[in-house]
């Protein structure tokens, strides 16, 4: 399927070093456009179900993704995924996804993320709470990306964090100026407070008129 390249609006310098990139999801649109067109070496961080074989992919897509998050009828979701799951299973095999786990295996996710940065690639995380679906105005950022940034910091990597927002209607990916994790530590705020501030900024990138955002460019 052909996906037209979106416009990239940088509010600062282009991403020229291994970084932590945060983005909204917009269903599959955000991950696909970032994977295909963001001009920097990167790996996506995503749910382990999409990296665990065809049966797992089918179950996740048919129930969690299309039924619970996209609100499809369960029968049609299961029927559609008989075709979609094998194709996406092949796609994800080539994606080099960093699988995220909800249990003790998360340690392997964190270590793989650090290795990715050390190998010169950025890590892309989609921290929004999508349990009730995907929304234009995001309601919550999980703070796990800050745990990852903290692990990086303890291993000597002061990771720059970029907030981005994919504006599907305008086919534009807005990329904010980076913030170093060490600068966040100086604020003496909790992870939840910092995550909330990133959430607010992400929503600003998605809601402000593009001409106003252009005025913020460096």
Predicted regions and their residues:
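Structured catalytic/translocation cores of nucleotide/phosphate-coupled proteins
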Residues: 1, 33-35, 107
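A short, well-structured juxtamembrane/interface segment
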Residues: 1-18
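A broad, low-specificity signal for short, low-complexity segments enriched in glycine/proline
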Residues: 2-7, 59-62, 83-88, 121-122, ...
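Short aromatic/hydrophobic-glycine micro-motifs
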Residues: 3-6, 96-97, 207
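General small-molecule cofactor/ligand-binding pocket signal
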Residues: 9, 98, 162
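Short, charge-rich binding segments
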Residues: 12-14, 35-36, 89-91, 114-118, ...
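Catalytic core of membrane glycerolipid acyltransferases/transacylases, capturing the structured
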Residues: 16-102
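Non-catalytic C-terminal accessory region of glycerolipid acyltransferases
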Residues: 102-218
